[in-house]
């Protein structure tokens, strides 16, 4: 896709370039994306729990009890494929999409090295464009740590709704916007603890749960669950809890009718 086309889509070119420059770091578990590797088991398990709890289908071969196994999954803003690969390993048929060409090269190479080519593929396409041609084609859609990096997150949420089959589950994650999240996600994570590169986040783009709820409701999703993601810098331990002051995930469902 030409750069001028990307510029016309819902994307901040500077954000794409920022992550493209870090493409070589995606699978370095102690590098720039170490935090994503550390939180991935938590978010993966929570995604699967919500699929088991909320997924509904008339297809007897795709039951909720099976979790991700056998489901057709779309990972929006997949980056280097950390979450995409982990879902494929749990038996899902996964498509990852991103606008960072270097990210996708890193993701595709690692998928090939991991022998996951049969159940995992990547595409360089905006989610809105995919929604125009593949509406209702996915059982599960994930969009993690991406909404706070785009100009119009509501359009992303709406596209996720369109891509889901009725009864499907969508899981979204982002960062709350308040003084505590600024202190933890920017001052703490980027400047004090150096968990993330400086400039990774823009506080103005953070999204409150109420704002994300409204985006989901406007897209006609039904809320299923919400959870906060927490970190203790002393013990270097991550965990999930009800407090959503900083990082959080929500699970929503596309109604059957």
From Swiss-Prot:
GO terms for molecular function: 2-polyprenyl-6-hydroxyphenol methylase activity; 3-demethylubiquinol 3-O-methyltransferase activity; polyprenyldihydroxybenzoate methyltransferase activity. Its EC number is 2.1.1.222, 2.1.1.64. Keywords: Methyltransferase, S-adenosyl-L-methionine, Transferase, Ubiquinone biosynthesis. The keyword Phosphoprotein does not apply. It catalyses: a 3-demethylubiquinol + S-adenosyl-L-methionine = a ubiquinol + S-adenosyl-L-homocysteine + H(+); a 3-(all-trans-polyprenyl)benzene-1,2-diol + S-adenosyl-L-methionine = a 2-methoxy-6-(all-trans-polyprenyl)phenol + S-adenosyl-L-homocysteine + H(+). S-adenosyl-L-methionine binds at residues 43, 77, 98, 144. GO terms for biological process: methylation. Pathway: Cofactor biosynthesis; ubiquinone biosynthesis. O-methyltransferase that catalyzes the 2 O-methylation steps in the ubiquinone biosynthetic pathway. NCBIfam families: UbiG. Belongs to the methyltransferase superfamily. UbiG/COQ3 family. This is Ubiquinone biosynthesis O-methyltransferase. It comes from Psychrobacter cryohalolentis (strain ATCC BAA-1226 / DSM 17306 / VKM B-2378 / K5). The lineage of its organism: Bacteria, Pseudomonadati, Pseudomonadota, Gammaproteobacteria, Moraxellales.
